[in-house]
């Protein structure tokens, strides 16, 4: 039994609140257990300088945490005057993952910014950010589609992320909270599409190694969790938008 009473193959309780903010074209509050992230999508009718005139769009992301999202206060990065390496890595990961399921040609010459702001952290902030940012992004694109329908809906597939790991006494587990993540012998983040394709695997042994059998178990757990997360995404977005993503 895990520290929070879950089975090894169970996600934390997932709650998604759509339209959480009034101004962005798309927004959600996603809660994964005690981890809570506000994800918002903003549409700009311009692209980065290196893409101007190509007729293609772009997806970019920024990630941040409230100073007291963790058990001790962190100094705001804006006060430090620079973004940390961890933050840069995470926001690049979010943008890269989302671009994997978007037809940038179909999007047209516009940028969609995803802002992922962690208001409470208990492990899995980057995976929750990706899962929530996907919903916010699709909401924004769906609003564009309602105003002037796309000849081809830009979102090609669903996308979600989760964590898996190996605990010293608990074996392989799905969706680690902070206590588990801190003590895990192996920690892995998995990003997958709705059709079962991998977008990214980030796996590391923490002063430990893992076998091919354990790797297979971790991937199987991740696939199960992501399948459940994508069903939640579909419920949140509704049948009409889900059908557009499927090309129906």
Swiss-Prot record:
Keywords: Nucleotidyltransferase, RNA-binding, rRNA processing, Transferase, tRNA processing, tRNA-binding
Positions with a binding annotation for phosphate: 86, 124-126
Enzyme class: transferase
Gene Ontology biological process terms in this record: rRNA catabolic process; rRNA processing; tRNA processing
Organism domain of life: Bacteria
Coiled-coil residue spans: none
Keyword Transferase tagged: yes
Gene Ontology molecular functions: 3'-5'-RNA exonuclease activity; RNA binding; tRNA binding; tRNA nucleotidyltransferase activity
Segments crossing the lipid bilayer: none
E.C. code: 2.7.7.56
Short name of one Pfam family: RNase_PH_C
CDD domains: RNase_PH_bact
Catalysed reactions listed for this entry: tRNA(n+1) + phosphate = tRNA(n) + a ribonucleoside 5'-diphosphate
Quaternary structure, from the entry: Homohexameric ring arranged as a trimer of dimers.
UniProt cross-references to NCBIfam families, sorted A to Z: RNasePH
Classification via PANTHER family: EXOSOME COMPLEX COMPONENT, EXOSOME COMPLEX COMPONENT RRP41
Protein family according to the UniProt entry: Belongs to the RNase PH family.
HAMAP family (UniProt xref): RNase_PH
Functional note: Phosphorolytic 3'-5' exoribonuclease that plays an important role in tRNA 3'-end maturation. Removes nucleotide residues following the 3'-CCA terminus of tRNAs; can also add nucleotides to the ends of RNA molecules by using nucleoside diphosphates as substrates, but this may not be physiologically important. Probably plays a role in initiation of 16S rRNA degradation (leading to ribosome degradation) during starvation.
Name assigned to this protein: Ribonuclease PH
Organism in which the protein naturally occurs: Listeria monocytogenes serovar 1/2a (strain ATCC BAA-679 / EGD-e)
Organism lineage: Bacteria, Bacillati, Bacillota, Bacilli, Bacillales
